[in-house]
Amino acid sequence: MRAVLDTNIYVDFASGKLDVVNLLAIQSTEILLPAIVMGELFYGFIKGSRTRYNEEKFHHFVSTLDVYFIHVNEHVARKYAIIFSALTNNGTRIPINDVWIAACCMSVGGTLLTRDRHFEQVSQIDKIILP
């Protein structure tokens, strides 16, 4: 599985939550991280009291597990437009960053790993929503 991580999944992994650690270890052939998730993580690191520690832990995660980054480009922007249009047509609203995360996932044909149930509304992507 090409696992595209949502912010909450990285946080759970970094905290050592076994369901996430096992899922990534057993089922993932590739781990991908959208640029938007990196932005959310760095924001959290800056807001917290252990900025340097959290950044070092993140960089260790990226280098140890050979994580690939999904950058926002024209291809991702087009996927964003498709997803956002479908959500709007259905009268559905989800956080805008999550539309971008879904677009990143769609652009690489990955499976989004998340704990956010509102991704159930995004039919264009494969997803695993953990409890």
Write out the residue ranges for each language-model feature:
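Short, hinge-like loop/turn segments at secondary-structure boundaries
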Residues: 48-52, 87-88, 129-131
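Short, well-structured N-terminal submotif of metal-dependent ribonuclease cores
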Residues: 1-34, 43-60
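A generic structural signal for short hydrophobic patches within well-formed alpha-helices
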Residues: 10, 38-41, 119-120
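Conserved beta-strand segments of alpha/beta enzyme cores
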Residues: 30, 66-68, 126
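Generic structural signal for small/hydrophobic residues in well-ordered secondary structure
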Residues: 6-7, 41, 80, 105
